[in-house]
């Protein structure tokens, strides 16, 4: 998927595309299996954990991703 497709996905869900949101979405799309928050934290070790959590919460609220409570 190219950058414009990621931007379109965010805009389609009324999410403003920022560099960090695009980075997180690209990283999520790169997984070939289900992944956890810990997996994302490991992959995105330069991103603050609270920022990552807030972004995932935003994605969940706008139905860009779905979550599973464990």
Regions found by a protein language model. Give the residues of each.
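Short acidic, hydrophobic short linear motifs in intrinsically disordered regions
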Residues: 34-43
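Short alpha-helical segments that sit at the start of domains
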Residues: 1-25
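Short coil turns linking two alpha-helices in DNA-binding domains
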Residues: 47-48
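Basic amphipathic alpha-helical segments that dock to polyanions
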Residues: 52-63
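Short, Lys/Arg-rich nucleic-acid/phosphate-binding segment
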Residues: 69-70
């Amino acid at each position: 998927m190219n950058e414009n497709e990621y931007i379109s996905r965010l805009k389609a869900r009324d999410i403003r595309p920022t560099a960090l949101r695009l980075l997180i979405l690209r990283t999520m799309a790169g997984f070939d299996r289900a992944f956890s928050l810990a997996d994302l934290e490991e992959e995105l070790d330069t991103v603050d954990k609270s920022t990552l959590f807030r972004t995932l919460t935003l994605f969940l609220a706008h139905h860009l991703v779905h979550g599973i409570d464990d």
